[in-house]
């Protein structure tokens, strides 16, 4: 497990620039989203990744994408997965051999896997949910073998693809356009390395993906060590090693534990005193009860940060409390687009052939969320909770 002291690497050795973010939810072909993100490449220099929601939904298996430092590590670490009860049904090269001569790449493979039986999961980890078991083993693998390998996609539905190069290189290396014939429900694209130094094999590219959770982030949290401490106290493993990871894991925890969008906003983006003064007495009591929780108190995000989080059928956009990073949203009844620049949204609406009903920059510290519902997009109000009731 990564220690809190090692967690925040600062900006050492990183080129100037800013992350390019694009998140789209709706029904679309991939090429339109990829073309839309190209206008953000100037910000990013190198490091690019794509998460495609719905890529593997017909398979009914968990699919792992794993990068290895070299060929010698492959059999050794495949054996480690088997020892944890994970059955490898099929293994495939995710990258054509010719690209290993053109680019400096780790060995990249994909695996169709099944978890242990419920009885075996209970014996091994005292849990019976297959998705949770796989997530735990992925975090364990990435922590133990950080310098030798990284599982960067582990979903039954989504596929994540990362490189240390530009977006067009990522598309080429993985032959992303081979998936063009289908329609997809959501897509996240991130350009540039994160601002924390990180550790391990090809640590930098995003989206960071774990099970059905994926996220992208622009900025740098000054609160990352406190955020990491909160996750550590909850027993949630940090397994990639950048500040961005905290945002996504905190969002996942808060949604899973049935906090409303408004409460999540209170936790991660604290109100200014004058805003608290304007709250009615009951709301003020709720607010202080939540933010005075000793663990939730550490989840406050400080510093410049905008992020997009995809969790199951929910896509959420976060802005920092002081609006230190640009963030824009466009939408109609069929599509929701979030990006680090308005022109990426306009580009997406053009390539998607969609006329947007709204195009705006959210207020500082606001969370905006949408639910994907059979190709339609529903904006969620602040009272929304995963389980419906408090």
Which stretches of residues belong to each language-model region?
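Conserved short alpha-helical segments that host acidic/polar catalytic motifs at enzyme active sites
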Residues: 1-390
């Amino acid at each position: 497990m990564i220690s809190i002291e090692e967690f925040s690497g600062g900006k050492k050795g990183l080129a100037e620039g800013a992350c390019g973010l694009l998140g789209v939810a709706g029904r679309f072909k991939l090429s339109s989203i990829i073309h839309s993100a190209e206008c953000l490449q100037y910000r990013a220099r190198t490091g690019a990744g794509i998460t495609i929601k719905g890529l593997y939904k017909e398979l009914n298996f968990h699919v792992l994408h794993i990068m290895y430092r070299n060929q010698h590590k492959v059999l050794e670490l495949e054996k480690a997965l088997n020892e944890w009860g994970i059955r490898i049904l099929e293994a495939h090269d995710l990258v054509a051999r010719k690209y290993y001569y053109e680019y400096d790449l780790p060995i990249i493979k994909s695996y169709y896997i099944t978890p242990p039986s419920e009885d075996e999961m209970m014996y091994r980890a005292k849990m019976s949910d297959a998705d949770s078991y796989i997530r735990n083993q992925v975090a364990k693998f990435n922590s133990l073998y950080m310098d030798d390998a990284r599982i960067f996609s582990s979903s039954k539905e989504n596929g994540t693809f990362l490189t240390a190069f530009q977006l067009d290189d990522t598309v080429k290396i993985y032959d992303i356009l081979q998936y063009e014939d289908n329609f997809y429900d959501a897509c996240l694209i991130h350009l540039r390395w994160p601002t924390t130094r990180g550790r391990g094999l090809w640590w930098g590219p995003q989206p960071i993906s774990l099970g059905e959770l994926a996220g992208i982030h622009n900025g740098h949290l000054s609160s990352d060590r406190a955020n990491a401490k909160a996750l550590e106290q909850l027993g949630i493993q940090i397994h990639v090693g950048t500040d961005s990871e905290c945002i996504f894991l905190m969002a996942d925890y808060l949604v899973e534990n049935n906090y409303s969008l408004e409460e999540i906003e209170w936790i991660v983006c604290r109100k200014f005193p004058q805003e608290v003064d304007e709250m009615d007495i009951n709301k003020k009591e709720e607010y202080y009860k939540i933010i005075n929780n000793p663990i939730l108190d550490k989840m406050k995000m400080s510093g410049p940060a905008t992020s997009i989080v995809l969790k199951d059928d929910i896509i959420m956009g976060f802005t920092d409390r002081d609006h230190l990073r640009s963030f824009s949203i466009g939408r109609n009844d069929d599509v929701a687009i979030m990006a680090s620049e308005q022109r990426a949204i306009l580009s997406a609406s053009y390539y998607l052939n969609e006329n947007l009903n709204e195009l705006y920059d959210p207020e500082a510290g606001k969370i905006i969320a949408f639910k994907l519902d059979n190709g339609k997009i529903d904006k969620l109000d602040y009272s929304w909770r995963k389980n419906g009731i408090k």
